[in-house]
Amino acid sequence: MVHEYDNTLKVCLVRSLIGVPSRHRLSVRALGLRKVSDMRKVNDTPQVRGLIKKVHYLVRIQD
């Protein structure tokens, strides 16, 4: 079942992953971010919001 979401968020990695717990690294990777200043458009779903909440200190969100 495929859902189309009108709401998307732009997520940008603003801090390095050096010294960050491995679970937080995995969350950043799940958002599709690899390097500092990488930006990715993601669907605005509860699952994505949870990932962003977990790593809020590493990313910047733009609507």
Curated annotation (Swiss-Prot):
GO terms for molecular function: structural constituent of ribosome. Keywords: Ribonucleoprotein, Ribosomal protein. Pfam families: Ribosomal_L30 (PF00327). One of its GO terms (biological process) is translation. GO terms for cellular component: cytosolic large ribosomal subunit. SUPFAM superfamilies: Ribosomal protein L30p/L7e. It comes from the Bacteria. Part of the 50S ribosomal subunit. Belongs to the universal ribosomal protein uL30 family. PANTHER family: LARGE RIBOSOMAL SUBUNIT PROTEIN UL30M, MITOCHONDRIAL RIBOSOMAL PROTEIN L30. NCBIfam families: rpmD_bact. HAMAP family: Ribosomal_uL30_B. This is Large ribosomal subunit protein uL30. The lineage of its organism: Bacteria, Pseudomonadati, Pseudomonadota, Gammaproteobacteria, Lysobacterales.
